[in-house]
Swiss-Prot record:
The protein, known as: Mitoregulin
Gene from which this protein is expressed: Mtln
Function text: Positively regulates mitochondrial complex assembly and/or stability. Increases mitochondrial membrane potential while decreasing mitochondrial reactive oxygen species. Increases mitochondrial respiration rate. Increased mitochondrial respiratory activity promotes myogenic differentiation which facilitates muscle growth and regeneration. Increases mitochondrial calcium retention capacity. Plays a role in maintenance of cellular lipid composition through its interaction with cytochrome b5 reductase CYB5R3 which is required for mitochondrial respiratory complex I activity.
Mitochondrial intermembrane side of membrane: 28-56
Subcellular location: Mitochondrion inner membrane
Superkingdom of the organism of origin: Eukaryota
Keywords annotated in UniProt: Membrane, Mitochondrion, Mitochondrion inner membrane, Transmembrane, Transmembrane helix
Tissue-specific expression: Enriched in heart and skeletal muscle (at protein level). Also enriched in adipose tissue with lower levels detected in liver, pancreas and brain (at protein level). Higher levels in differentiated myotubes than in satellite cells.
Amino acid sequence: MADVSERTLQVSVLVAFASGVVLGWQANRLRRRYLDWRKRRLQDKLATTQKKLDLA
């Protein structure tokens, strides 16, 4: 194995950790946005269906 200095190891671990945090944060934001969109869409569908039933 190549001789890796302690500093390089610390920096690489820090970079890996930071990228994992950022990636997880972005993925969670995306998931939240998707769930909010789905909820809104289903509520709109429900409202239109209820309107149709009321008119029938």
